[in-house]
Regions:
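Hydrophobic faces of well-ordered beta-strands that scaffold small-molecule active sites
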Residues: 52-56, 88-90, 120-122, 150-154, ...
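N-terminal beta1-alpha1-beta2 module of alpha/beta enzyme domains
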Residues: 36-118
Length: 377
């Protein structure tokens, strides 16, 4: 679709509604395919058919370096492909020693080159950090290299701290231009018009599927107005999950990309042989969230036996509030948790974060999740 002026209409209409309710947004984010993209492996609840995908945080641990984290992410994708997961996404984070996916498009290429069928994408690119034209070039190039396998999730959060924003040359008003920037990316990925003077080569015509990522009502309204799939970051910001999904579905306007609402829900799932073992593994993630509030983000830490000795009551309340939508336990517990979440949200797809310290143990968690959900080959 070439740019024919409709973007200006969409932008004006979107702003009229979005400016009425625009809380601050911050997400790491997440997410999937279009309605024409068939799902052959599903979680079955009474009324829903839900695909499973993975958000890989590309964690650098106390026992691995950045190269190890990147290779581990690729290895997760290889196994996920065999186990029936729909897609794997990585996210843009800057100046974080424990996350190695800052150059998100490069990491996507690394993962896609090691796999054959699983979709690979950004969950997401923090678009105000970049020129839309450059993002279109990057993801259009990925789409030429890996046809039919690339997703582009877009968010407007910084993905870093205020000091690093200055190094990124991000301006204070950049987030305000997010709706227009999304339209620009979409236009550059569309087939170029005959009189179009600026073309994103080789991206023009690739029409890489776009996703709107969010953790508030703002993203839900924008995704609905533009007719794009919506991924909610409930794996760390669960409070507005249900209201945001309701807003998105009620206001959705069909588009050339999508003819019906499509929702992805982020969820932390850690599976092990027993509930007790899964809870022990989950302490790695609990410590990571605690460290966010302490301002001491660092490398991923190995699990501990007594999490109560690590955090204060206030820190526990803060961390567990962010982790409220987590499913931790044995395969039976995981099955029940997934079934309940799907029934409550009607999610078309779940984006699974399994933040386990040891690589082999994390693979086992993903395998148990796939088996419990009934998607494993």
């Amino acid at each position: 679709m070439s740019h024919d002026g409709r973007g200006d209409f969409y932008l004006a209409s979107a702003y009229l509604e979005l400016e009425k309710e625009k809380p601050p947004i911050s997400f790491i984010a997440i997410w999937p395919p279009l309605s024409s993209d068939p799902f052959t492996r599903v979680v079955r609840s009474e009324s829903f058919m839900t695909a499973l995908s993975i958000l890989d945080l590309v964690r650098v641990t106390e026992d691995t370096d950045a190269r190890g984290a990147l290779d581990n992410a690729r290895d997760v994708a290889v196994h996920a492909e065999a186990w029936g997961y729909r897609r794997i996404w990585v996210a843009e984070h800057h100046n974080m020693p424990g996350i190695a996916s800052a150059a998100t498009s490069v990491v996507i290429g690394h993962i896609a080159a090691g796999t054959k069928t699983i979709r690979v994408g950004a969950g997401g690119i923090m678009l105000p950090n970049h020129a839309p034209y450059v993002i279109a070039e990057q993801f259009g190039t990925l789409a030429r290299l890996f046809p039919g396998r690339i997703d582009l999730g877009l968010g407007r959060a910084p993905g870093t701290d205020q000091l690093t924003l200055r190094a990124l040359r991000r301006t204070p008003e950049a987030a305000e231009n997010f709706p227009q920037d999304v339209l620009e990316v979409q236009a550059f990925l569309a087939p170029a018009g005959p009189n179009q003077r600026i073309r994103a080569v080789p991206a023009a015509g690739t029409e890489v599927p776009l996703w709107i990522l969010g953790s508030s009502n703002f993203g839900a309204m924008l995704a609905a107005k533009l007719g794009l799939p919506y991924a909610f970051a409930s794996h760390f910001a669960p409070e507005l999950l249900i209201p945001a999904l309701q807003i998105y579905r009620s206001r959705f306007e069909p588009s050339e990309q999508l003819d019906r609402p499509y929702t992805m829900v982020g969820v932390n799932i850690i599976a092990a042989g027993s509930d007790d073992e899964a809870r022990r593994l989950a302490t790695t993630q609990q410590m990571s969230f605690t460290n966010i509030f302490r301002g001491t983000r660092g490398l991923s830490q190995p699990p501990i036996n007594d999490i109560e000795s690590y955090w204060s009551p206030v820190e526990k309340a803060q961390a567990m509030g962010m982790l409220a939508r987590s499913i931790v336990g044995s395969p039976a517990t995981v099955f029940s948790g997934i079934d309940t979440l799907v029934a409550e949200t009607g999610a078309d797809e779940l984006m699974v974060v399994s933040d386990v310290y040891d690589h082999a143990t994390r693979l086992r968690s993903f395998e148990l999740i796939a088996s419990a959900a009934g998607i494993a080959s």
